[in-house]
Swiss-Prot record:
Reactions mediated catalytically: S-sulfanyl-L-cysteinyl-[protein] + uridine(34) in tRNA + AH2 + ATP = 2-thiouridine(34) in tRNA + L-cysteinyl-[protein] + A + AMP + diphosphate + H(+)
Matching Pfam families: tRNA_Me_trans, tRNA_Me_trans_C, tRNA_Me_trans_M
Record flagged with keyword Cell membrane: no
This protein's encoding gene: mnmA
Keywords: ATP-binding, Cytoplasm, Disulfide bond, Nucleotide-binding, RNA-binding, Transferase, tRNA processing, tRNA-binding
Name of the protein this chain belongs to: tRNA-specific 2-thiouridylase MnmA
Listed CDD domains: MnmA_TRMU-like (cd01998)
Organism: Salmonella choleraesuis (strain SC-B67)
GO function term, MF aspect, one: ATP binding
Assembly and oligomerization: Interacts with TusE.
Protein role: Catalyzes the 2-thiolation of uridine at the wobble position (U34) of tRNA(Lys), tRNA(Glu) and tRNA(Gln), leading to the formation of s(2)U34, the first step of tRNA-mnm(5)s(2)U34 synthesis. Sulfur is provided by IscS, via a sulfur-relay system. Binds ATP and its substrate tRNAs.
Length: 368
């Protein structure tokens, strides 16, 4: 008697990657069902229309593939475990990455638990561009085969136990191949553009959105030499290395370097700027990271040579990690790096393998 196929619940977002993931798993012999997660309570017409369209696309794909689509509302979990922390970080003058938190708390926690306990799933699957490999009895997280779309940076908080319960079908493909499969299958999502913006909140004017929840506090813009040259509308709207949207204009004759944000004085509500994207005040020789997550779930001790990304799509930076007390590490770069931003994540790699990462607590500036 043959064994019944393993059941996989695919997180269906209404996008092309999850659509093709569902089909690929069908081809591999799994019993596939979809789950559409509603993680945000829309409060205006535009938001509602986007969410409704995504659900309709997910349903159309599932109908085409002949699979059942479940829906679940995780809006309360998202608000409590992602959004409130996101606002707290902005209030503190840091720049958080909500997509990482959303993966940790929603997609690979709330969704994983719901799929296993309520839907009887053996695995969950998502349309992330990452791969998994089993080494010495532990599942490892690998970069996606398409280096341009690799999303391992956003999944570093996952432990080997979660990865063992997760499948990433498109991680073995390149994006154009995924779109070609969707076109050949006649899926409505084939030409749908990739979503951008905050995880589950979608594409909207970020400044307007943030302003709904946090009151703006205007303050001075000063240069590194102490000259006041303008006014900002709120530190939360600015991040290190930012050039656009400062409202201080360019240089008079257009020959000098443009202004960049090099620091935020949260205590005094002052934005500090300098000219040139390689200004010494913008450069860091390293960083201190906290809230560490290692994929193998082993505590880190001692010293390690590896590479690090301090933001998504950044070229890997060779570095040395030194363990500090209290679950913190010091990271020293081989060469100075621009715009290392507190609140963002530092993610570590050994070749193709994502080792884990942590939140940047502070940068170690090139100049003090």
């Amino acid at each position: 008697m043959s064994e019944s196929p393993k059941k996989v619940i695919v997180g269906m977002s209404g996008g092309v990657d999850s659509s093709v993931s569902a089909w690929l798993l069908q081809q591999q012999g799994y019993q596939v069902e979809g789950l559409f997660m509603k993680n945000w309570e829309e409060d205006d017409g535009e938001e509602y229309c986007t969410a409704a369209a995504d659900l309709a696309d997910a349903q159309a794909v599932c109908d085409k593939l002949g699979i059942e689509l479940h829906t679940v509302n995780f809006a309360a979990e998202y608000w409590d475990n992602v959004f409130e922390l996101f606002l707290e970080e902005y209030k503190a003058g840091r720049t958080p990455n909500p997509d990482i938190l959303c993966n940790k708390e929603i997609k690979f926690k709330a969704f994983l638990e719901f799929a296993a306990e309520d839907l009887g799933a053996d695995y969950i699957a998502t349309g992330h561009y990452v791969r998994r490999a089993d080494v010495n009895g532990k599942s490892r997280l690998l970069r996606g085969l398409d280096g341009n779309k690799d999303q391992s940076y956003f999944l570093y908080t996952l432990g080997h136990e979660q990865i063992a319960q997760s499948l990433f079908p498109v991680g073995e493909l390149e994006k154009p191949q995924v779109r070609k499969i969707a076109e050949d299958l006649g899926l409505v999502t084939a030409k749908k553009k990739d979503s951008t913006g905050i995880c589950f909140i979608g594409e909207r004017k970020f400044r307007d959105f943030l302003g709904r929840y946090l009151p703006a506090q205007p303050g001075k813009i000063i240069t590194v030499d102490g000259d006041e040259i303008g006014e900002h509308q709120g530190l939360m709207y600015h991040t290190l290395g930012q050039r656009k949207g400062l409202g201080i204009g360019g240089t008079k004759d257009g020959t000098e370097d443009p202004w960049y944000v090099v620091d935020k004085d949260v205590e005094n509500n002052v934005l500090i700027v300098a000219q040139g994207h390689e200004h010494p005040r913008l450069m860091s020789v390293g960083l201190i990271a906290q809230q560490l997550h290692w994929v193998d779930r082993e505590p880190f001790t001692g010293t390690l040579r590896c590479t690090v990304k301090t933001r998504y799509r950044q070229t890997d930076i060779p570095c040395t990690i030194n363990a500090l007390d209290d679950d913190r590490i010091e990271v020293i770069f081989d060469e100075p790096v621009a715009a290392v931003t507190p609140g963002q994540s530092a993610v570590f790699y050994s070749g193709e393998v994502c080792l884990g990462g942590g939140i940047i607590e502070q940068r170690l500036p090139l100049t003090v």
